[in-house]
From Swiss-Prot:
Composition skew (Basic and acidic residues), residue ranges: 923-932
InterPro entries: Kinase-like_dom_sf
Name listed for the protein in its UniProt record: Uncharacterized protein ORF72
Gene name, Swiss-Prot/TrEMBL: ORF72
Organism whose genome encodes this protein: Ictalurid herpesvirus 1 (strain Auburn)
Location of region: Disordered: 348-371, 923-944
Highest taxon of the lineage: Viruses
């Protein structure tokens, strides 16, 4: 061991500085030689290399001894390894895999010329640990696991690469200690081909025992081709091997294309680097002839396969010694690559050899005479035609991006449809992910996107002033939205289209709790969103202190931006880091009343905000407030700027707000001289990184565009030279991107060439569809990153919200192509520049984009990038695909290592059109059959069927139809739509949050309704009837529960007279006598999705009316039908169809659709009286139908006002359907465990299931209504008698409370007022309807038009 140490030190000194002046070894030469090392392992299995107590590699007598030393000195006693810092469950297994290894000797040191250079004796022992050779005595460090976590199944840089598991029968210990692990070898091979810099960094441990370095490989032309060949063979990939690398002569374009591809590939994978950004990187240039030899890997065996008899290639293993790439010459101005045909593929790649190949063979047998240093070609060389060369060139992998859909409707959808129909190209929508300091959880596919028209553009062609004005307005309008983290919107995009600007704004989703939910939890449990409990009574203050800085920031932002965000309680989120507001809209004025009322409503328990009238605050509450809070509450609606600035500065609230960077993509028209035209296709707003606060005026932002260039011509819009120079790198990478896209376009043409240049292509496959399928396949495994879209595309010079990317160090300045350079100087002085920071950011960053970048982006996806669907009313909806996710390297349709070819599409060449709805069985449970693809969902569900609902607007019938399609139809196979999965997840989450359990617990009160507590509740209809199970299916997207009654025997088919449109809409003609009752929580999804709950109950009597139907449900239904539609219960619409004497079929829709956001404007005079009348009238309607509500909640009050002073309309919905059915089946749903207000008579009797059914009475309903009115009604609007009556409604004893009739009299409520009948619209319910192409179970119901003719 000591000898090893001495040699180590000696070798080290000679390498790094002691060698004489004229014998300095060349860094790249040493590395390239080291890559060809062949080792032989010691036969003694017991001697083991591992760390000694000081952390240096030494030799132990047995693996157990090495393990004992490791455990004693290199772990923290728990789960953390001190050497590599990984936290692992089994430290012993970790040590065997990563930090212990076998001893070996380097056999071929003399042949490689390293023995003399490094002064290494052939008999020196090295340790082979973790895929690297270590000197004995070197510092223990991770080898390959610097780049792969020890148990990783994926490469750290290639999102789609998986490692094969260790083969069965191998023990981990045996594998790690023999150095023959296929896993390690695969990883080393993968590193060499795909990430050579990482590979070289791992073998520097051999050259220098003191340190390992981070390297970057720069190859010569030949080396690049060699590396590309290794990549083509798919080293380190799991699964089938790709086709053999073709043997051919290729024109110069191929070498260039390979070079561009590798450059692009390395740039993208570098962005995913796990190394810290300040790591120094050593550049290694490989000259011609110095590339890694083909026997490159630290192999398990030390025998070299002779080059003359190549072994047959096994799947996943490559015979590395075959001399595939023999020589590269220049001939007639072209670079010719000739690969020796000793490894010609079995058979021909293109079927039979073409005549041109036979001709070319003779030519290539003649020697190439343009270089005397080159040997003559002694074997036959296969070549191909130029046409096939072109095809071959286009089969180099391109870059693809995982895509998420954006929905356009209205005018923009029409435009996109028009462009697609005429030219097959469309404006490519780009969306930017905003990466703020305190991001909300963002889940793009699970959001509904609304397009809102902001400003008309007018004619932009010749009018530069108008164009600037438009941009100015667009930027002003959008600027407020790019501020994070207070006004929190997850995505911002702006899209110019034939004179309109569309912005895409999205609300936060995920696990955030709104203010109302937070307060509900706080008032009952005293638990804060950030954890920890508060003594009763002080939680309001704690919340106010928690969010006060954010409210000051809100006020400061309003003051600075001169806008007022309009938000309600449902737009306010309190979470552990403070306050988040997702405003509903923005008004161009300053009014901080809403921000003040936010605090006041917290302290005084007002339910809703107001934006124009300041809420009163009680004197005793004021007395407890700090001076800052009081100062903010006393400010006028437009506060003095100096005071706001002073408070904001003192509290430091603006520190994490920078300026949003606005990027104007320019067309750089090379053919037309230097004229640059600002085109209004895309305006990207980049979010500010958390940075010191600076806010240039709009004039400053636009001045960059107005700066005149070198020429004095005023009409020419020049940009400052500094801005262009600082983006030279950006332009270069943009051009590379355009080239990559162009190669994809060429692939399409190549497919029509004879036979194809790269093997048989599946018939009918075109480049676009293959790409799209591969993208879908790869998107499941991509790495999510938080960087913005343009940074993803390699434009790292834009300082986007991305992690600092280490730049490749440039070549050492003093070296030219062929000369040696001083290694000592290299190591001491040239440590590689720190990552380039870039010039100081200017407010406007202007990339020079290639002339056809938009068109090329579209070429990547072709027309299929857009899906056009049509709503029932004839409106077009265009679904575009944007690119906010990880780029994945994929290839055009050649059988390449990156993806397996997909089967051909069913209808090649056809554009997606609107698909008529097919009627299919929704699930096996309902007796339906799946279609040929195994999917039980219809063809347009999913992204194409998303609905855009504008806030404050009624839901139209066609939108209702769409919503029904993606939310409410049950389907077991939810895998076909990630959207449905998201919806289902949201519902189940809400349900669990309220009820704590998915198991429906049933009440036992009605004697004919016996329930067991078993996991599957059993429902009996009569005491002696068959017991039928209730199926609880958690996969259903619409609700967590489905109760099914089927025919007890299940054998009889449905009588013919019952095969109506109702059975057919499920495609379910075997459904005998079945009722599906969908119970569950209301849909309450953020963004602009409407809160809609549809109960679809279908049942069919057997041989008698209502036969075999549970009496309790019969009671509920019969009573429901008594409730008439009114102004306050908008519609509960029931259809009963008599089919024959034998049975009835009833479809029932309870459609509860609120008016946008619930807003209560309590400031309107007389409002309280109006509200009381509306609520009492509704309660009367429900009670006189013989039903009890059981629980009421403010969230169900929806008030629609068109403007102040106009007619008010309240839609008070007691969740009529859900509450009634829940109260019958599961009283546990009465507010769940977190109900803020329950009648006093329930408190001692509450069970997990809620109150006993007999306690849900008229008196308990009146108590809930009384508590509701005390929250909502302003006392100044009421007489003292009315106030006393409301207080009496909240009396503790039920018998003291007034009844509904008392309320009608005392509040002067007429029991029924004239009501305009509901406009049913066109009812698609036709009894004789046998057309299967239309939904026949949706009743489109619209609200009455206000002020309809009497």
């Amino acid at each position: 061991m000591d000898g090893g140490m001495t040699v180590s030190d000696k070798g080290n000194w000679s390498f790094f500085g002691m060698a004489s002046e004229n014998k300095r070894p060349k860094w790249a030469a040493i590395l390239s030689k080291a890559m060809g090392i062949q080792a032989s392992f010691m036969t003694d299995q017991l001697r083991t290399a591992g760390p000694n107590p000081e952390g240096l590699i030494s030799i132990h007598n047995s693996p157990d001894e090495a393990l004992a030393v490791y455990s004693a000195h290199h772990t923290d006693g728990l789960n953390t390894c001190k050497i590599c810092g990984h936290n692992v469950r089994d430290l012993k297994a970790h040590a065997r895999q990563v930090h212990l290894g076998r001893l070996c000797k380097i056999e071929n040191l003399a042949e490689l010329g390293l023995a003399q250079t490094l002064r290494i004796d052939r008999d020196v022992e090295f340790a082979y640990i973790d895929g690297c050779y270590f000197w004995i005595g070197a510092r223990a460090a991770p080898g390959l696991s610097r780049f792969f976590k020890p148990d990783a199944t994926r490469c750290h840089r290639c999102p789609t690469v998986e490692w094969p598991d260790i083969e069965n029968g191998e023990s981990l210990e045996a594998v790690r200690l023999t150095g023959e692990s296929p896993r390690l070898t695969d990883r080393a091979r993968h590193l060499l081909a795909f990430h050579p810099g990482d590979f070289m960094a791992s073998i520097t441990t051999l050259i220098s025992p003191k340190k390992s370095m981070n390297c970057e490989a720069i190859y010569s032309a030949r080396g690049e081709l060699q590396r590309f060949q290794l990549m083509w063979r798919g080293y380190g990939y799991k699964g089938e091997r790709a086709t053999a690398f073709p043997t051919k002569a290729v024109n110069e374009g191929f070498g260039t294309a390979v070079h561009e591809f590798l450059k692009m590939y390395d740039a993208r994978t570098k962005a995913l680097s796990v190394l810290p950004s300040d790591t120094k990187i050593y550049t290694v240039r490989f000259m011609e002839g110095e590339e890694p030899t083909t026997a490159v890997i630290p192999p398990g065996t030390h025998s070299v396969v002779p080059a003359t008899t190549p072994a047959p290639e096994a799947p996943g293993k490559l015979n590395m010694s075959s001399p595939d790439l023999e020589l590269i010459r220049r001939k007639g101005g072209k670079r010719v690559i000739e690969m020796v045909s000793g490894v010609a593929p079995s058979g021909s790649l293109v079927g039979a050899p073409s005549p041109s190949e036979r001709v070319m063979k003779r030519k290539s047998e003649r020697p190439l005479d343009d270089s005397s240093a080159v040997k003559r070609v002694s074997k036959k060389v296969t070549s191909v035609t130029d046409q096939e060369c072109t095809a071959w060139e286009s089969s180099i992998p391109g870059v693809s991006i995982e895509r998420a859909p954006t929905i356009y409707t209205g005018k923009s959808a029409q435009t996109i449809a028009g462009v697609l129909t005429e030219g097959g190209v469309a404006p490519y929508p780009l969306i930017m992910d905003v990466d703020g300091e305190r991001d909300l959880p963002i889940d793009l596919p699970n959001q509904i996107i609304t397009g809102r028209v902001i400003e008309s553009l007018g004619d932009l062609e010749g009018d530069i002033a108008a164009r600037k004005e438009v941009i100015k307005k667009a930027v002003e309008a959008l600027r407020v939205y790019s501020y994070r983290p207070l006004m929190q919107l997850s995505v911002i995009g702006i899209f110019f289209d034939e004179g309109w600007i569309y912005s895409v704004l999205e609300k936060p989703t995920g696990d955030l709790k709104t203010m109302s939910q937070t307060l509900r939890v706080l008032s009952t449990t005293g638990t804060f969103p950030w954890g920890g409990k508060s003594p009763a009574g002080t939680w309001k203050m704690a919340i106010v202190h928690h969010i006060f800085r954010d409210v000051v920031k809100l006020v400061a932002l309003q003051n600075r931006l001169k806008v007022t965000p309009v938000f309600g309680k449902q737009d306010v989120y309190v979470w552990e880091h403070g306050l988040t507001i997702a405003p509903n809209s923005v008004e161009p004025r300053v009014d901080i009343t809403g921000a003040q009322n936010l605090i006041i409503s917290l302290l005084s328990q007002y339910t809703m905000f107001q934006h124009t009238t300041k809420l009163p605050i009680k004197p005793e509450v004021r007395a407890t407030l700090s001076p800052d809070v009081l100062k903010l509450l006393d400010w006028p609606p437009r506060p003095p700027s100096s005071e706001v600035t002073e408070m904001a500065g003192r509290l430091g609230v603006m520190g994490d707000i920078g300026h949003p960077t606005i990027q104007f993509p320019l067309d750089f028209k090379i053919h037309m001289g230097s004229e640059r035209v600002l085109r209004p296709d895309v305006l990207l707003i980049k979010p500010p990184k958390a940075a010191p606060s600076f806010y240039p005026s709009m004039e400053e932002v636009l001045r960059v565009l107005e700066t005149p260039g070198p020429r004095s011509d005023e009409s020419d819009e020049m940009v400052p030279a500094s801005a262009l120079i600082s983006h030279a790198t950006l332009a270069a990478s943009q051009r590379g991107l355009v080239a990559a896209h162009a190669s994809v376009g060429r692939a399409q043409a190549a497919l029509s060439t004879r036979g194809g240049a790269f093997g048989a292509t599946p018939s009918g496959e075109d480049a676009t569809s293959a790409l799209m399928k591969m993208i879908q396949e790869l998107s499941n495994t991509s790495i999510p990153t938080s960087r913005s879209l343009l940074c993803e595309l390699g434009l790292s010079s834009m300082r986007g919200p991305a992690v600092a990317t280490p730049r490749p160090a440039e070549a050492p300045p003093s070296t030219s192509e062929g000369e040696l350079f001083d290694v000592d100087a290299f190591l001491e002085k040239w440590t590689g520049p720190a990552p380039v920071e870039g010039t100081a950011p200017v407010p406007v960053e202007i990339p020079i984009v290639g002339d056809d970048i938009i068109r090329q982006s579209m070429a990547l996806a072709g027309g299929e990038c857009w899906e056009l669907t049509e709503t029932p009313s004839g409106n077009v909806v265009a679904t575009g695909f944007t690119t906010p996710a990880t780029p994945t390297i994929i290839n055009p349709p050649s059988p390449h290592v990156f993806a397996v070819p997909m089967p051909p599409p069913a209808n090649p060449g056809k554009r997606t059109k609107s698909v008529k709805r097919r009627i299919e069985a929704a699930s096996k449970m309902e007796g339906g059959e799946r279609d040929a693809t195994g999917s039980s969902m219809d063809t347009v569900r999913g992204t194409g069927g998303l609905v855009t609902v504008k806030p404050q607007s009624l839901i139209r019938g066609d939108e209702l139809g769409l919503m029904d399609k993606w939310v409410f139809e049950p389907a077991l196979d939810t895998r076909t739509s990630s959207y449905l999965r998201g919806v289902h997840r949201t519902i189940v989450q809400r349900w669990l949050q309220n009820h704590g359990s998915m198991k429906p617990k049933m009440c036992r009160d009605p004697p004919t309704f016996a329930i067991t507590d078993a996991d599957v509740p059993i429902l009996t209809t009569t005491p002696d009837a068959t017991r039928r199970p209730i199926c609880v299916d958690n996969n259903l997207p619409s609700t967590p529960m489905v109760f099914t009654w089927g025919d007890p025997n299940g054998s009889e088919p449905v009588p013919t007279e019952h095969r109506t449109s109702y059975e057919l809409y499920r495609g379910d003609i075997q459904a005998a006598h079945q009722c599906n009752l969908y119970l569950g929580p209301s849909m309450e999804i953020y963004a602009y999705s409407p809160r809609v709950w549809i109960a679809q109950h279908t049942f069919d009597g057997a041989n008698q009316i209502w036969g075999g139907f549970p009496p309790v449900i019969r009671y509920v239904y019969l009573n429901m039908m008594k409730i008439r539609p009114s102004k306050h219960i908008p519609y509960i619409y029931t259809v009963i169809e008599p089919h024959s004497v034998k049975g009835y079929k009833m479809n029932m829709y309870a459609l509860i659709t609120p008016m946008g956001h619930p807003v209560l404007t309590t400031g309107v005079a007389g409002y309280s009286k109006y509200l009381i009348k509306a609520l009492v009238r509704t309660l009367h309607a429900v009670h006189s139908a013989g039903l009890k509500i059981g629980y009421m909640h403010p969230k169900n009050v929806w008030v629609k006002t068109d403007a102040l002073g106009s007619d008010l309309q309240t839609y008070y919905i007691f969740d009529v359907v859900t509450q009634i059915l829940e109260n019958v089946f599961m009283p546990g749903s009465v507010g769940g465990r977190n109900a803020p207000v329950i009648p006093p008579e329930w408190t001692s009797k509450m069970t997990d299931n809620g109150p006993p059914l007999n306690l849900i009475t008229e008196a308990s309903d009146i108590f809930c209504l009384g508590r509701l009115l005390t929250v909502f009604c302003a006392q100044q609007d009421l007489t003292s008698e009315q106030v006393a009556l409301i207080q009496l409604m909240c009396a503790a004893k039920p018998e003291e409370r007034p009844c509904v009739t008392d309320l009608l009299v005392n509040f002067n409520v007429s029991p029924e007022e004239p009501f305009y009948p509901v406009d049913i619209g066109e009812m698609p319910v036709k009894i004789t309807n046998t057309k299967k192409a239309e939904r026949s179970n949706t009743a489109y119901v619209r609200f009455p038009v206000q002020g309809a003719q009497e």
